[in-house]
Amino acid sequence: MAAFKLDFLPEMMVDHCSLNSSPVSKKMNGTLDHPDQPDLDAIKMFVGQVPRTWSEKDLRELFEQYGAVYEINVLRDRSQNPPQSKGCCFVTFYTRKAALEAQNALHNMKVLPGMHHPIQMKPADSEKNNAVEDRKLFIGMISKKCTENDIRVMFSSFGQIEECRILWGPDGLSRGCALVTFTTRAMAQTAIKAMHQAQTMEGCSSPMVVKFADTQKDKEQKRMAQQLQQQMQQISAASVWGNLAGLNTLGPQYLALYLQLLQQTASSGNLNTLSSLHPMGGLNAMQLQNLAALAAAASAAQNTPSGTNALTTSSSPLSVLTSSGSSPSSSSSNSVNPIASLGALQTLAGATAGLNVGSLAGMAALNGGLGSSGLSNGTGSTMEALTQAYSGIQQYAAAALPTLYNQNLLTQQSIGAAGSQKEGPEGANLFIYHLPQEFGDQDLLQMFMPFGNVVSAKVFIDKQTNLSKCFGFVSYDNPVSAQAAIQSMNGFQIGMKRLKVQLKRSKNDSKPY
């Protein structure tokens, strides 16, 4: 027995020595370090908001609380002698898990001594090409009898699988779909090419679907599209998008949501998101700017009580839109909801040649209800907000306006106003300069009709060349409409020029303008 012990102990000592001499060494905290290289899926992290006085040793002590650290590289300003820390670094853990745990514990959570802001920790730019969302696949139309192991076996031939998960319903049963994450995007792409619609599994009505899983941005777009679709269905049930009075339910939140979805879709080029929203078909990226003006104007009108009161007493041409079939004379007795008016313009955008002039017509609901007392008791703030909202509109399409108004009304005004030089009361006559060369009397009338009843619109023509002098006069039947037109149209850009709109001077002055 003793001989056995003597023979055995040296072997134990040799084994113990060999363990200590192996590449695996002990860390300061007592846990075993990793040999040589980090794991294949390890992440290089960028860390900001660290003290400039901290060295690699200080940073290592901070990060090793979350796992073994392979490498730390402090970024330094080489123009100084000696080079000084820039207050940021790169850190690579041996495992992906340790890096994510450190990020969860430190990012925007911990403020280091001497710093005013919390640590910023995120994957380095070089890691973005290997983001999880670029390697994760959605597998649909799989048998509900499949287990995670079955899915792993099915896809393991395409590369190393980092994660495999069956999606379960609230009833505890499989939803017939799964998520599979590979270690590289190339592996995921190979799996898509080989497996998408390659087979129809038991209990499934169509072939297997294999595609990249939706990113958070994709999910957000789908959610917004669903909300918009529900809004449109509700409105459609009440008015079939034909009776504009049914648009009373539209608020600025809806318009802002509409704008946000369009902006994201236009920037991403993913027009499929809007395929189910048929009333939106007439809008394009050039009209997003105008829709933003509508949303801002709607919000301003709703948030200004005095402005809303003025809007509800409107007798402007826009009231014709909300009372289908009514005559101009009867339209003044109809109450116009400001949000419905703006919503009506947004709805008609798809039917117009351009939304720019149409969006200006939204002003009319305000202008018609503003009297001199209205301008002095605070409703002018709403007018200012609306003017600012429309200040960004850069394009102009005169052909759009006739589609927004009752054609009979337009014809009646055209007969009496276009080309005539009849003047309105004092303060209701405008001088317009920098008109496009091709603009005629009818174009001038159409451009200024949204702000009130135009009694005359005249573009001056050079008698020798028979060409426009690029200026003209517009007269309203009241000074309030003239002021509204000045606020909205002065500085309005058409092509390469900006309109100059001001009050026509009195006959007693030496110059008419």
From Swiss-Prot:
Primary subcellular site in the record, as a coarse category: nucleus
Species assigned in the record: Pongo abelii (Sumatran orangutan)
Coiled coil regions, renumbered to chain: none
Quaternary context: Associates with polysomes. Interacts with HNRNPH1; the interaction in RNA-dependent. Interacts with PARN. Component of an EIF2 complex at least composed of CELF1/CUGBP1, CALR, CALR3, EIF2S1, EIF2S2, HSP90B1 and HSPA5.
The family this protein is said to belong to: Belongs to the CELF/BRUNOL family.
InterPro entries (UniProt xref): CELF1/2_RRM1, CELF1/2_RRM2, CELF1/2_RRM3, Nucleotide-bd_a/b_plait_sf, RBD_domain_sf, RRM_dom
A Pfam family assignment: RRM_1
Single GO BP term: regulation of RNA splicing
Modified residues (Phosphothreonine): 31
Name of protein: CUGBP Elav-like family member 1
Region of interest (Disordered), residue spans: 304-336
